[in-house]
């Protein structure tokens, strides 16, 4: 990818540090891609957009959803298991807000994205459970994929 060619983002140092820890792909410009692809249409500046995203990610990482991914490193993970973890974490219907995307790498299908549909408006203090779009409109393209260990041979590279 040529994400480094995209315009650099202006973020407060604390936000940039948190984003770098949460998004290792930032070193290759993934944050720029995410901003262009998803953030700029949201009507906020990059600082506010990424603060909201980091707040939601913090909530996700404190939930059983993180645990289900960790427990499936180097193993297949089904969308059914992910949806069940969302239901346990964020209430009835929450699993309908998520889908998986997978990418073929080295003869395996790796989970490359967890997509979470949100309703607007979302703020930096929004509880994730209250902003999930439970309509189930996006079914994704991946029923089962392997969760790759960071730094392993099959790791997706930008």
Regions from the PLM with identified roles:
Residues 19-158:
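C-terminal, well-folded lobe of enzymatic/effector domains
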């Amino acid at each position: 990818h040529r994400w480094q060619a995209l315009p650099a983002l202006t973020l407060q140092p604390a936000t940039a540090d948190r984003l770098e820890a949460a998004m290792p792909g930032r070193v290759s410009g993934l944050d720029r891609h995410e901003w262009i692809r998803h953030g700029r249409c949201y009507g906020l500046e990059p600082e506010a957009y990424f603060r909201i995203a980091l707040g939601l990610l913090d909530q996700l990482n404190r939930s059983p959803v993180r645990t289900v991914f960790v427990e499936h490193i180097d193993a297949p993970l089904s969308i059914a298991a992910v949806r069940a973890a969302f239901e346990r974490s964020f209430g009835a219907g929450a699993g309908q807000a998520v889908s998986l995307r997978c990418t073929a790498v080295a003869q395996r299908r790796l989970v490359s994205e967890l997509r979470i549909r949100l309703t607007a408006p979302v703020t930096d203090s929004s509880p994730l459970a209250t902003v999930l779009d439970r309509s189930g409109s996006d079914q994704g393209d991946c029923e089962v994929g392997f969760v790759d260990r960071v730094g392993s041979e099959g790791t997706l590279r930008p």
